């Protein structure tokens, strides 16, 4: 362990050091979020000596909970347990927890001591040091706050071993910012020379870069503790970043991701004013690229984005203030004009938002993504927003051959909601792709439905063929793999009314077919009678035989070698149930393996509990069709003799983003 300042320690496996600083307090509150609590509360209970005076409080995880509503219950808890001015708060978590814990300590009984134990890289190099503590106002980030220095800061780089990759990269964005804030470029060169060791979480290198970042930040904090002058330079990249976070409701981009883009914005402005050259800008871009951090700005409407930049706390007299630098490392705080902002953002017209909507038999889904256009090729860069609603558009369509009015109304309500979200993000009409699948194409009144949706939402629906659906599914899945991936894959999508199969590889599609077997269709055919569900063994056997008979059309596929990849709700739900997910985690699901045995286990669980109790990981709105869908899934594996499949989150929504759905 290294003492880098009187109150700041950096090292590995140094949590026990806390015992040296807790003896003089009558009560201790370990304040964290639910994710960190699950990982580390037990370790703290075994590490801290005076266990009878230690209390624990965990809030929900996320920037959206960094508000007064989340803090009031903490005050209540502290009052109920007789916390006094001689009590201590230990903030255990990332930037949100460090900010909130500091704010609580600054305001409870007009101030008590607190210790920061930052668990994310972002918090270790930023939020835990400097004494700025704050919570968010609904209209602006960090608007309600104070200045209060922690009693101690204990930085243990071992925490970074359990940090998700995205969060580590977010911290690197803020850490790299510090390398631009010093004229001495040795720190920047050290980072460039140790990229692989940093990525591999080498303790010695991590300790060095965290220490150096803290020294740079502490320099500015010490000469300007209340941010009246040079400390503002620490806000390099933050004017753009805070506006970007606000535009997307603090959900699409982590703080470090936004700051990385914001640094490039400030450097673009520095270039525009002739303070740096293109080579300097490109070197900066490349440094971020070494850590797979995207720094391209997004082409957003200036009439919505510029007002958000005006709300930054550096501003006054209605001026937008940001930080510039020159090639020698001199920093300056300056006003940026609206025409300069427009000129910079216009350089990124090929980096924009695109939306795709899938109107299925059972559900409607929306994906909004950041994409890049190069000539006519679209590259997916980032998921911005994703949603699913069970609308049951295809209710009884297999029997009646038309879409019921109440089903249309349910779907229309969902599409009106999606229209509002799309409009909020100012997505151009040409970048809204909406397609309908099996239920719509099987109905006799599809033209009425399509016209009604357009009249009331201005969303243009393309009713696509099974072949087209298979094509965009494949394109969505294959985007997950590197270009040098050579294996054949067979992608299947169990929808509500049909299941699409597409065989191919990175070079293209070889075969595709759409079969009229789907989770809604099988349920209505074998398990639903007069609105009552009957999953008897006899009905299940009939359903399995029906699926097997339909799968015979895949005889040509059976002779080939391929990896089997499943997409869409029936398949992804199997993983969320296996993992007992209370909150759906698409990153954990994407490209995970799912075995035949696990599918069998899930099917038994569904049959046993479908009408009795909630099943963790199963959306209650999907339970009506999950047994039928799981039977189809299991029969597909059995037909091809596969012990497992790969589960992909990328499907026709992604394919539509990349390829569109118009016939070419």
Swiss-Prot record:
Coiled coil: none annotated. NAD(+) binds at residues 61-66, 95-99, 119-120, 132, 141, 159-162. This is Bifunctional 3-dehydroquinate synthase/phosphatase. One of its GO terms (cellular component) is cytoplasm. It holds the Pfam family DHQ_synthase. Residues 1-352 are annotated as: 3-dehydroquinate synthase. Keywords: Amino-acid biosynthesis, Aromatic amino acid biosynthesis, Cobalt, Cytoplasm, Hydrolase, Lyase, Metal-binding, Multifunctional enzyme, NAD, Nucleotide-binding, Zinc. Pathway: Metabolic intermediate biosynthesis; chorismate biosynthesis; chorismate from D-erythrose 4-phosphate and phosphoenolpyruvate: step 2/7. InterPro entries: ATPase_NBD, Dehydroquinate_synthase, DHQ_synth_AroB, DHQS/DOIS_N, DHQS_C, Ppx_GppA_N. One of its GO terms (biological process) is aromatic amino acid family biosynthetic process. The keyword Zinc applies. It is found in: Cytoplasm. The keyword Oxidoreductase does not apply. Binds 1 divalent metal cation per subunit. Can use either Co(2+) or Zn(2+). Monomer. One of its GO terms (molecular function) is 3-dehydroquinate synthase activity. It catalyses: 7-phospho-2-dehydro-3-deoxy-D-arabino-heptonate = 3-dehydroquinate + phosphate. Zn(2+) binds at residues 174, 238, 255. Its EC number is 4.2.3.4, 3.6.1.-. In the N-terminal section; belongs to the sugar phosphate cyclases superfamily. Dehydroquinate synthase family. Its cofactor is NAD(+); Co(2+); Zn(2+). Residues 353-664 are annotated as: GPPA/PPX.
């Amino acid at each position: 362990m290294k003492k880098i300042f009187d109150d700041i320690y950096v090292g590995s496996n140094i949590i026990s050091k806390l015992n040296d600083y807790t003896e003089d307090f009558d009560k201790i509150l370990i304040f964290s979020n639910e994710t960190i609590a699950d990982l580390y509360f037990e370790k703290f209970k075994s590490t801290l000596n005076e266990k009878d005076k230690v209390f624990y409080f965990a809030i929900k995880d996320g920037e959206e909970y960094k508000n007064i509503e989340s803090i009031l219950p903490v005050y209540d808890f502290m009052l109920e347990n007789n916390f006094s001015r001689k009590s201590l708060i230990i903030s255990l978590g990332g930037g949100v927890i460090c900010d909130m814990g500091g704010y609580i300590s600054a305001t409870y009984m007009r101030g008590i001591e607190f210790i920061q134990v930052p668990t994310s890289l972002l918090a270790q190099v930023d939020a835990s040091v400097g004494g700025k503590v704050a919570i968010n106002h609904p209209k602006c980030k960090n608007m309600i706050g104070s200045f209060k220095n922690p009693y101690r800061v204990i930085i243990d780089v071992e925490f970074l071993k359990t940090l998700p990759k995205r969060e580590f990269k977010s911290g690197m964005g803020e850490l790299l910012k510090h390398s631009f804030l010093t004229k001495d470029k040795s720190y920047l060169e050290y980072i460039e020379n140790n990229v692989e060791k940093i990525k591999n979480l080498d303790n010695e290198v991590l300790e060095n870069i965290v220490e150096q970042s803290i020294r740079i930040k502490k320099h500015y904090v010490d000469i300007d503790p209340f941010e009246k002058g040079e400390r503002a330079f620490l806000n390099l990249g933050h004017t753009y970043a805070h506006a970007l976070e606000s535009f997307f409701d603090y959900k699409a981009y982590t703080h470090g991701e936004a700051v990385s883009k914001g640094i490039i914005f400030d450097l673009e402005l520095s270039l525009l004013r002739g303070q740096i050259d293109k080579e300097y800008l490109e070197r900066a871009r490349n440094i971020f690229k070494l850590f797979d951090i995207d720094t391209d700005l997004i082409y957003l409407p200036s009439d919505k984005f510029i007002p958000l930049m005006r709300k930054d706390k550096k501003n006054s007299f209605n001026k937008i203030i940001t930080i510039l630098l020159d090639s020698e490392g001199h920093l300056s705080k300056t006003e940026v004009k609206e025409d300069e902002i427009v000129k910079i953002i216009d350089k990124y017209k090929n980096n924009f938002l695109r939306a795709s909507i899938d109107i299925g038999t059972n559900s409607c889904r929306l994906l909004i993504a950041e994409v890049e256009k190069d000539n006519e090729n679209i590259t997916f860069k980032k998921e911005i927003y994703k949603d699913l609603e069970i609308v049951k558009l295809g209710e009884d369509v297999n029997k009646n051959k038309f879409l019921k009015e109440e089903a249309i109304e349910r779907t229309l309500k969902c599409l009106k909601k999606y229209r509002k979200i799309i409009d909020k993000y100012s997505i151009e009409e040409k970048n809204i792709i909406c397609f309908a699948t099996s239920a719509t194409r099987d109905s006799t009144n599809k033209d009425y439905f399509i016209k009604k949706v357009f009249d009331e939402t201005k969303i243009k629906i393309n009713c696509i063929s099974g072949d087209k659906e298979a094509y965009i599914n494949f394109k969505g899945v294959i985007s997950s793999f590197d270009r040098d991936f050579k294996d054949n894959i067979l992608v299947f999508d169990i929808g509500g009314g049909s299941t699409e199969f597409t065989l191919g590889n990175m070079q293209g599609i070889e075969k595709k077919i759409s079969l009229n077997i789907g989770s809604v269709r099988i349920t209505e055919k074998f398990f639903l009678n007069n609105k009552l569900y009957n999953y008897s063994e006899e009905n299940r056997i009939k359903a399995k035989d029906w699926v097997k008979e339909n799968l015979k059309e895949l005889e040509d596929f059976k002779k080939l070698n391929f990896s089997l990849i499943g997409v869409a709700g029936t398949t992804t739900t199997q993983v969320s149930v296996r993992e007992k997910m209370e909150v759906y985690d698409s990153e954990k699901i994407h490209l995970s393996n799912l075995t035949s045995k696990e599918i069998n286990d899930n099917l038994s669980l569904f049959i046993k509990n479908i009408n009795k109790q909630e099943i963790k990981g199963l959306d209650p709105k999907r339970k009506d069709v999950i047994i039928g869908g799981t039977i189809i899934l299991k029969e597909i594996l059995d037909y091809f003799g596969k012990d497992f499949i790969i589960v992909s989150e990328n499907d026709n929504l992604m394919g539509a983003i990349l390829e569109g759905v118009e016939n070419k």
